Amino acid sequence: MIQVEIVSPQGMVYSGEVESVNVPTVEGEVGILENHMYLMTLLKPGLVYFNGDDKNGIAVTYGVLDVTPQKVLILAEEAYEVGKLPPASKLKEEFEEAVKKMATAQTMEELKEWEKEAEKARTLLELVEKYR
């Protein structure tokens, strides 16, 4: 068993021991078991799920994944239990707004910021549609 903690600025979202955890990262999905090698990488929006059950889990946005042989710590900008995701209408609105802002971005920095927002909203919307 490996200890998993998922924390957002609002506080602890999940804490428990699991056989395995799958985490979306910028390098792809990472599967983690007890005694995993040390790892630190960046999260990308997606679903963190436990024990191979990809029907339930915690939706995360951007952040950091820190793995030690006994513990997985996920520090996410936003994290939601699958049943508590924002409404689809709100996510669609956020996505459309980000796409509009991308079209009018004045700098590469602005463009990257709005691309990130669009990816986050699109991914959360896909999770809402899949799990509701």
From Swiss-Prot:
Compartment(s) of residence: Cell inner membrane
InterPro entries named in the record: ATP_synth_F1_dsu/esu, ATP_synth_F1_dsu/esu_N, ATPsynth_dsu/esu_N
GO molecular function annotations of the record: ATP binding; proton-transporting ATP synthase activity, rotational mechanism
GO BP field: proton motive force-driven ATP synthesis
Entry-linked SUPFAM superfamilies: Epsilon subunit of F1F0-ATP synthase N-terminal domain (SSF51344)
Keyword field: ATP synthesis, Cell inner membrane, Cell membrane, CF(1), Hydrogen ion transport, Ion transport, Membrane, Transport
UniProt-listed CDD domains: F1-ATPase_delta
Bilayer disposition of the protein: Peripheral membrane protein
Any one of the GO CC terms: proton-transporting ATP synthase complex
Family matches, as PANTHER family: ATP SYNTHASE DELTA/EPSILON CHAIN (PTHR13822), ATP SYNTHASE EPSILON CHAIN, CHLOROPLASTIC (PTHR13822:SF10)
Self-association state and partner proteins as the record states: F-type ATPases have 2 components, CF(1) - the catalytic core - and CF(0) - the membrane proton channel. CF(1) has five subunits: alpha(3), beta(3), gamma(1), delta(1), epsilon(1). CF(0) has three main subunits: a, b and c.
Protein name: ATP synthase epsilon chain
Organism: Aquifex aeolicus (strain VF5)
